[in-house]
């Protein structure tokens, strides 16, 4: 009797698990379809660099000294982040915009994403596609690996302008045993995708954008939908990057490289978020030569909210660096 009862319970729970996974799978497919239905991101508009870990989408615009724009390392982000800046910068520079591995129109392989992976990507992209020493403007969570690329190979990057770099204390945190367990769950085919979809959907993206803007009424429906689509292209395989970021695999302690950098480095911060200025000051404490420019009434995306003022700051920093050479 007891054996029969156990068998019934096992059958019930097995059936329940199967039904639950089936429901999750259907929900995943529906959200993937909804997120990409508008086709706002056209992969045919890009050129592609066949890197050893996957195809990297990029665009080349304008003429003049090379300038590489690196978007924030985030599953929702892409070179779309620079939409308000490219035309003006291209008047005096050859502007390269790149979609990082795991983002935008670039490939999203199921590997472990680390800071060093992106150091290698930036290094190889500059050497193989740009072909000469370049200036770099980099946003948010991508700032650390650009600094590490500078320290790793002094022949590839000239001047660096960072936009709201992350604070150094958080960057130094490393994965734990619990982190590895969470990463494995998020990498699982159905459950991992379902959890990713709970965290990265239209509502959560709209909320994140609202907290990133000082003037929230400037956020358009198209912006939200574009970020939503970017996060779910290629069968939602951005979940691999998401998992690695959430579990600190993309973190790296950059303190060891700051003191040996000879590059001209500047930081532009959105002053309406006090944490941005504090983080910038941390970098300046370790490397006093860093210049900081604050932009009032902006938060995480000053280059989008006040693009004219942003361009003015960029040209000042780039011209100042040229005079020092």
Where are these regions (language model features)?
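Conserved alpha/beta-hydrolase catalytic His-Asp/Glu region
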Residues: 172, 197-257
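Flexible "cap/lid" loop of the alpha/beta hydrolase fold
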Residues: 151, 160-191
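Alpha/beta-hydrolase fold catalytic core
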Residues: 1-67, 93, 319-325
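Active-site loop/oxyanion-hole signature of alpha/beta-hydrolase fold enzymes
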Residues: 97-137, 303, 312
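Catalytic active-site module of serine/aspartate enzymes centered on a nucleophile-bearing elbow/loop
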Residues: 288-325
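Short glycine-enriched nucleophile-adjacent loop
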Residues: 143-154, 160
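Conserved loop-alpha-helix segment in the C-terminal half of the alpha/beta-hydrolase fold
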Residues: 260-298
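Conserved HGGG/HGGXW glycine-rich cap/lid loop of the alpha/beta-hydrolase fold
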Residues: 59-105
